[in-house]
């Protein structure tokens, strides 16, 4: 039997030859560098009719095919266990920009936030500001914290003494410098550039807690505020800031049959530089995604539904736990993703014991009638691009958080056991490779966000740990 060094050299040469003949030049360069394979050996194998000295250099694929044929029965059984998704539905990868997960992507710990935050505190919300310079955090004990990433300092204040409730939602008003605060009493508060409450800038939008909120820029000084609450209403409001004065006008509302589970907004360009908006909402015990259009900049109109089950007689087969709008072809620098043929929705389901992800096509027809009866709303049953199982464990109480990191080419899912990466091309899912000092991120994820510049992510757990992770692209 040949010694290990000879067999290793020959194996490396087989692999290098395979990479070269299949045009995988970048992978070949990395392989040669990491194995220290002499380039001259590869060149000699080409110039000597696939011989290395007197040793014939076989084709790697032929070697593998022969091996499979020799042990075809055991290989057939073994292949069944390699993936939980043997036959994924075909999808136009080029159209939707779907690529394999970027395995060169790495993460490093920036700082453990606990050291500069109130001790023994569970944070229920963590959001980057629009300029990615600050992190806005809300705790279960009533604290609001503004963390300065560059200075590694934090400022906190007991907001519940002023708003008389724990803050559930906390985030930026686009790039205006203003922030919003939504405590659990259904109110909407404004904070100024110094993160202080603005006088006379509080509005009761919902009778009960606001569960979901989206802010969409209309003009330089006005924004749509789209909210859903525990009172089962979807509401559209207009926030205006003029000469230091703030106004919020309630425009439209729709009563929902059950509580909202996700809320997304997509901008529809009209070709004249103006945007209209489509609101995509899911709710409990309803396996459809409902689309509402904002008509005449003031009215919410139910435009269509997208069914996630094929049974037209049933609208409930599982719960939709989270939805995220993505576009892997066009980079998005605005606060609202734009509609294009490559835009799609990623849906996390309630299937047990393992979550499923569904990729959904969005209809391109944006010309909706101004009035439409509910029984005439069109339902699409042919918009599912891919429906696949994951290895993400969950139970009846799981609340997954979906996130998109552009350089990853895939989807991040914060769940009961940590943060998972999901490869949309292969359906592969696995716990994210996070440095050892952040082991607590393998607990239940309570909050997670990715900075606008895509350079950092923040995640907090049920064990009261919270971390900033640096995103290292094209790591070698």
UniProtKB/Swiss-Prot annotation:
Give one GO biological process term: regulation of biosynthetic process
Q: Where is the LisH domain?
A: 7-39
Q: What else is known?
A: Present with 1280 molecules/cell in log phase SD medium.
Q: Which GO terms describe its cellular component?
A: cytoplasm
SMART domains, alphabetically? LisH (SM00667)
Q: SUPFAM superfamilies this protein is in?
A: WD40 repeat-like (SSF50978)
Please report any disulfide bonds recorded for this protein chain, giving both cysteine positions: none
The source organism is Saccharomyces cerevisiae (strain ATCC 204508 / S288c)
Instruction: Return the protein name.
Output: Uncharacterized protein YGR117C
